[in-house]
Amino acid sequence: MELHFFPGQNLLAIKKGKVFISTYDAWGGPASMGSDPRMAEEPTWPGTYIIHSTHSYVTPSWPFSKIKWGTALQDKPEINDVYYQLPSKKWASVKKDTGIERKKIIDQYFTLYGKMKVPATWVFNDFGPIAIRWFKDTNGNKILDKKETLSGQMFHTTPDNEAENSLDKPINLVPSHGCIHLKPRDRDTILNSGGFKPKTIFVVHNYNETI
């Protein structure tokens, strides 16, 4: 089984043998560099890669992504804060660790789910519940070693699409900063079928290529 992404068509295809057996909507980055002052949009870089792993993703680059999706929360209105649970099971301040205030959390949850409250778990990580990582296999052994590194681009969903899926609304995929956005149910389907299994070959085609 191989994965093939056609960014010009917003299409991810599953290939078995010489035949494409299924396709899914998938949106990557733009064909040329963008101008977002926070982090410029970039193309999803063409090439042949190897799927490495699937895991929750956190990064200091984006405030809402400093906390893992699904992390337990405690509302603390008396001190105008929200606490989140650390891996140690202790609690820490969202405001102190991310700069995100309680009002922003409530407003964001209302935007996503239509309810003015602090949710029970963190549903704001920009990369969704899980990210699927890949790397350029320079020595052809399908193992991340030597000077090889994981790509900063990855498959993931978004908080908006996770909310739409949860509320049974139409999924509105949007372009990314270079990663590949998937619909939550499509991610689960591909994952359960073994499409994201480590060592799977993954090809990003040029923007002018079609399936």
Residue ranges and their predicted role:
Residues M1-R102, H205-Y207, I211:
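Intrinsically disordered, low-complexity
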